[in-house]
Regions:
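Extended ligand-binding clefts on enzyme/binding-domain cores
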Residues: 79-80, 93-209, 251
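CBM-like carbohydrate-recognition segments
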Residues: 16-22, 197-209, 218-234, 238, ...
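Short, small-residue-biased leader/transition segments that mark boundaries at the very start
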Residues: 2-9
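Well-ordered mid-protein domain cores that form the structural environment of catalytic cofactors
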Residues: 11-53
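Amphipathic alpha-helical segments of tetratricopeptide repeats
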Residues: 12, 53, 69-73, 128-129, ...
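Solvent-exposed loop and edge beta-strand segments that line ligand/cofactor-binding
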Residues: 1, 27-41, 84-97, 103, ...
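Well-ordered alpha-helical scaffold segments within catalytic/enzyme domains
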Residues: 1, 43-57, 101-114, 165-179, ...
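Internal, well-ordered domain-core segments that constitute the primary functional module
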Residues: 35-82, 91-93
């Protein structure tokens, strides 16, 4: 079928000879761009795991696990991936830490391997140790190698959508472990903090970026409403309500759902716009 064909095309055209994926290719598979990230690998592994689940084709479960292990190798091989910043500013980032939780969780649905739960544990431990900063009631996007607060524009950034996404990744893992209380408490703390930072009390919706010291945010899209933080909040609040039965989370779920469905869909064609201004008008 079509999905299988797309998988074959991806296998043939989207991997460079070193095993690292291209970020963009042409319609007929010629490489356009290759980036220093490994998010393409993570999403490809998730797609292959879901394909294996839908079709029963175990070959794709093995492919997903292979990509996952290769990704871990890339992340741990000194010099393979270009650092975001030169050694002048040693740092670690929230994004890859959190996406590895979801990637490992998706693959674990279709194939068993100890590296998967090990990575989930490693990522959650890193979130606790480095990224959660109670002094700001926030999970920060970028910190020093040992979790140090970096008092710059980038070091102060809170990405509420990312943090809310992390919260439901951890809730999903808590559910997998029979609603593990410690994991659930961690996830709810992140959700509560991030909702407080992210929900726009004036116009509604989850805002793009905040500064943990309430200083001006450098990113020019900082006060916009992108589609994906809203969907992460819709998922996370429903998970929280399922886990706790607390009506607060049901109200939050309804609040963000109503706002998103009132503002993002194209009223004529139904598809969602990707980006809105702060007041909810189409950007």
């Amino acid at each position: 079928g079509l999905v299988g064909s797309e998988m074959c095309i991806r296998d043939r055209h989207c991997f460079d000879t070193d095993g690292h994926m291209f970020f963009e290719v042409t319609e007929d598979g010629k490489p356009l761009r290759k980036r220093r990230y490994v998010f393409s690998e993570g999403f490809a592994a998730i797609a292959m795991a879901e394909y294996a689940l839908a079709t029963g084709e175990k070959e794709y479960a093995k492919k997903a696990l292979d990509i996952f292990k290769r990704t871990l190798h890339f992340l741990n091989a000194p010099g393979f991936l270009e650092p975001k910043y030169l050694p002048t500013l040693p740092s670690r980032g929230h994004s890859i830490t959190m996406i590895l939780i979801n990637t490992a969780s998706r693959i674990r649905m279709v194939i068993d391997d100890p590296s998967l739960t090990e990575q989930i544990d490693t990522s959650i431990a890193a979130l606790r140790k480095y990224f959660i900063h109670p002094e700001f009631k926030a999970l920060l996007e970028m910190v020093g190698p040992d979790g140090e607060f970096i008092d710059t524009c980038n070091g102060r950034v809170i990405n509420p959508g990312h943090c809310i996404e992390t919260a439901w990744f951890i809730m999903e893992e808590a559910k997998y472990r029979n609603w593990d209380k410690d994991l659930l408490q961690l996830a709810l703390q992140i959700l509560d903090w991030s909702w407080e930072w992210g929900w726009d009390k004036e116009f509604g919706g989850i805002i793009n970026f905040r500064d943990c010291r309430n200083l001006p945010v450098q990113d020019y899209s900082q006060d916009m409403k992108f589609w994906w933080p809203q969907t992460e909040a819709i998922i996370a609040t429903l998970y929280a309500y399922q886990a706790t039965g607390d009506e607060k989370y049901l109200q939050m779920h309804q609040q963000v759902s109503y706002w998103a469905y009132a503002h993002f869909p194209d009223k004529e064609y139904g598809e969602w716009y990707g980006y809105l201004h702060r007041d909810g008008t189409v950007a």
